[in-house]
């Protein structure tokens, strides 16, 4: 795929975050948000969303809320799916199965959520197939 991950250390300050975003923006084709309590707060969220939006750099958000606020998309899961899986495991335990034999499980149905308005702003074309397959599309 030719992907290269670039890590930019961020000094959390009024000047530190914008400087890191600017440095990334000059070399990145997209930005991936990862959970980091030291970088993300209500004070930094606006800058984190605005820089990629203004510079037409796709930002892969942390959650549905980030997509609703302007990131291009996020990968998530339908919360009913892990709930159903948990209920099925509980039934197996109640029926006497030993928990030692249960393999590690992951959500069966990952989903993605798109922000079509952001895609249009960035002049990105999203196929009808992707739009139809999305769990939610913010327009």
Segments the model singles out, each with a brief description of its role:
Residues 1-139:
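Short hydrophobic alpha-helices and adjacent helix-cap/hinge residues
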């Amino acid at each position: 795929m030719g992907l290269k991950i670039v890590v930019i250390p961020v000094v959390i300050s009024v000047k530190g975050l914008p400087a890191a975003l600017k440095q990334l923006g000059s070399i990145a084709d997209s930005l991936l948000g990862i959970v980091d309590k030291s970088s993300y707060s209500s004070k930094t969220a606006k800058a984190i969303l605005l820089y990629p939006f203004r510079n037409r750099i796709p930002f892969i958000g942390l959650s549905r809320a980030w997509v609703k606020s302007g990131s291009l998309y996020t990968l998530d899961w339908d919360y009913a799916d892990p709930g159903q899986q948990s209920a099925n495991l509980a039934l197996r335990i109640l029926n006497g199965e030993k928990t030692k034999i249960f393999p590690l499980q992951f959500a069966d149905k990952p989903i993605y959520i798109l922000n079509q308005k952001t895609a249009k702003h960035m002049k990105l074309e999203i196929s009808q197939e992707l739009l139809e397959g999305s769990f939610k599309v913010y327009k």
